[in-house]
Amino acid sequence: MAAPGTKRVLIVDDDTSIVNVLRDALGLFRHDHTYTVETAADGAEGLASLERHPFDLVLLDLYMPRMTGLELLAEMRRRGLKTPVLMLTGNEDNKSAESALANGLFAYVPKPFDLQQLEILVSLAASSHSPVAA
C-alpha cells in the first residue's frame, strides 16, 4: 500500500525528454503529497500499465505510435476507468480537444507547458480521484 499522501502517476509519452521533464517536475511540486511515477512509451504500454495497477492520475501525450492518446483515453473510459487524465500536446486541433473532453478528459494542456500551471492542474486532478493502493 502507498504511504499516506502518495499519489500514483502514469506518464504516457514517446518523447523521453518530455517524460524526464515531467518526472523531475513531479518531484519538485510542493503539495501535501508525493508522487510515485511509472512511465509508458505509447498508448498500448500505458493500457498495459493501467491493467496492472490503479493510478491517481495519467499524464498523456496525444500523438504516439501504436495507440494514440485519444485512443487510450477512449479505451480507459470504455473499461470504466475514471482516472483523471491530463493530455499534453503541441497540437492546436480543436477536434482532438473536443473528442478528448467528450471522453472525460480532466484538462487539455498545450505544449510547451508552464510548470506552475501544470503543478496546479496535477494537484487538482490527483486530488479529485479516490486514493489507490500501491
Task: Write out the residue ranges for each language-model feature.
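C-terminal output helix
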Residues: 113-123
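Acidic catalytic/metal-coordinating carboxylates
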Residues: 42-45, 68-71
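Receiver (REC) domain active-site loop signature in two-component systems and cognate sites
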Residues: 64
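Active-site beta3 strand of CheY-like receiver
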Residues: 53-59
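Conserved phosphotransfer cores of two-component systems
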Residues: 29, 51-53, 75-82, 103
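Alpha4 helix (beta4-alpha4-beta5 surface) of REC/receiver domains from two-component response regulators
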Residues: 71, 92-107
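Two-component/phosphorelay signaling modules centered on CheY-like receiver
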Residues: 16-38
